Amino acid sequence: MKTFSPTPKDINRQWFVVDAQDQVLGRLASQIAHRLRGKHKPEFAPHMDNGDFIVVVNCEKIKVTGNKLADKKYYRHSGWVGGLKTTILGDVLADKPSRALMAAVKGMLPKNRLGRAMLKKLKIYAGPEHPHTAQNPQPLTLPH
């Protein structure tokens, strides 16, 4: 019996829509990253992008546990001396809630070209509407 190695023609991608209302940020992000990577499929290969497309709606109603709204910090640097910028999670969720979920999922994917390609299959929207109805995304229920 030979070992099966998938090829690009073997990839069958589906579209799923996930409702993020009352979901915990980290738990939701780990399940989304799992699906984006394709680890739920029997033909998973770590060197290929065979994950599905995920559309997340109601991102503005996402939950966090503990004191993370005040304690968790996001850092970015301008490249200049003294150019370190710090933002807390509460401000990020108030300003652009999709950015917090995107950062959480990005941290759970590979840090290379393949991970960037996987992240392009994630579509996040703050409200309940999304423009991907033509792809006929199937509702995906994730445990709380």
From Swiss-Prot:
A single GO cellular-component term from the record reads:
cytosolic large ribosomal subunit
Q: Identify the Pfam families for this entry.
A: Ribosomal_L13 (PF00572)
List GO BP terms, alphabetically.
negative regulation of translation; translation
Q: Which GO terms describe its molecular function?
A: mRNA binding; structural constituent of ribosome
Domain of life of the source:
Bacteria
PROSITE patterns with a match to the protein in the record: RIBOSOMAL_L13 (PS00783)
InterPro entries xref list? Ribosomal_uL13, Ribosomal_uL13_bac-type, Ribosomal_uL13_CS, Ribosomal_uL13_sf
Q: What does this protein do?
A: This protein is one of the early assembly proteins of the 50S ribosomal subunit, although it is not seen to bind rRNA by itself. It is important during the early stages of 50S assembly.
Oligomeric state and partners? Part of the 50S ribosomal subunit.
Protein family (similarity comment): Belongs to the universal ribosomal protein uL13 family.
Question: Mind telling me what this protein is named?
Answer: Large ribosomal subunit protein uL13
Naturally occurring in which organism (per UniProt): Desulfovibrio desulfuricans (strain ATCC 27774 / DSM 6949 / MB)
Top-level taxonomy: Bacteria, Pseudomonadati, Thermodesulfobacteriota, Desulfovibrionia, Desulfovibrionales
